[in-house]
Amino acid sequence: MFNRVVLFLLTNFAVLILAGIVMSVLGVNPAQMSGLLVMAAIFGFGGSFISLLLSKFMAKRSTGAQVITEPRTQTERWLVDTVRRQAQAAGIGMPEVAIYDGPEINAFATGANRNNALVAVSTGLLQHMREDEAEAVLGHEIAHIANGDMVTMALLQGVLNTFVIVLARVVGGIIDSALSGNRDSGRGFAYYIIVFVLEMVFGLFATMIAMWFSRRREFRADAGGAQLAGRNKMIAALERLSLNHGQNTLPSQVQAFGISGGVGEGLRRLFLSHPPLTERIAALRASNGTAM
């Protein structure tokens, strides 16, 4: 947690420096932008952290996941016991364990912190994966929690949101002034249209950055799953996923934390939260099952 706080502070410091440079280049006095920066930070980080705090509730509600409070079957008992064992090995609190109805082979983890998380698997995973493969998938999700990926993604998204809000308004103000001949007549309707368009454009670039980080995060979670369950099991699980052609039924807010992501070529790959399965398998085969 301390490392993520340091990363958060350093990232914000870097963003402030970059914002100051951008404003200087554009001829904007940063001292006049303090109100905008505060507003942008409140909205940028506020939305991200509200989503993080509500992530378990929203995930359970949107997927219909049923938390296992008292195991009723051998499969449920195995799930709970495996998650407990892996959580202890990873040094995190025992997550809630749930099953949701979905035909695809998938699982996800979410939660506000390492000791208040949820691990859920699809019925399709339980039907189509062997026990050793499912163990590796659970290890992958436990690694996400142990690595603090949900918190880190929220911090990153907050920084990106803040930067998009500020930059869109700074650039929008400059364009509006140029179009109006620098007349000091206040902000017109055109300014808000320009800001809206710029937020969409800058938001696309911000999404690319967030998804790039998410793809790096998946490789690390694969390595963590290999450490907890075994590299061969993790490879076998990903190979099984590569044969899964079912539609991803996970809601968009939790898809980034599933074991299985979308597929795409060309520019579409820049917006994917998961690397291609072939690359993930190759990375595991080239590794030595290093730590999370």
Swiss-Prot record:
It is a multi-pass membrane protein. It is an enzyme of class 3 (hydrolase). Binds 1 zinc ion per subunit. Zn(2+) binds at residues 140, 144, 218. GO terms for cellular component: plasma membrane. The chain crosses the membrane at residues 5-25, 34-54, 155-175, 193-213. Keywords: Cell inner membrane, Cell membrane, Hydrolase, Membrane, Metal-binding, Metalloprotease, Protease, Stress response, Transmembrane, Transmembrane helix, Zinc. One of its GO terms (molecular function) is zinc ion binding. The keyword Membrane applies. Its main location: membrane. The keyword Mitochondrion does not apply. The active site is at residue 141. Its cofactor is Zn(2+). GO terms for biological process: proteolysis. Signal peptide: none annotated. Its EC number is 3.4.24.-. It is found in: Cell inner membrane. Belongs to the peptidase M48B family. PANTHER family: PROTEASE HTPX. This is Protease HtpX. It comes from Xanthomonas campestris pv. campestris (strain B100).
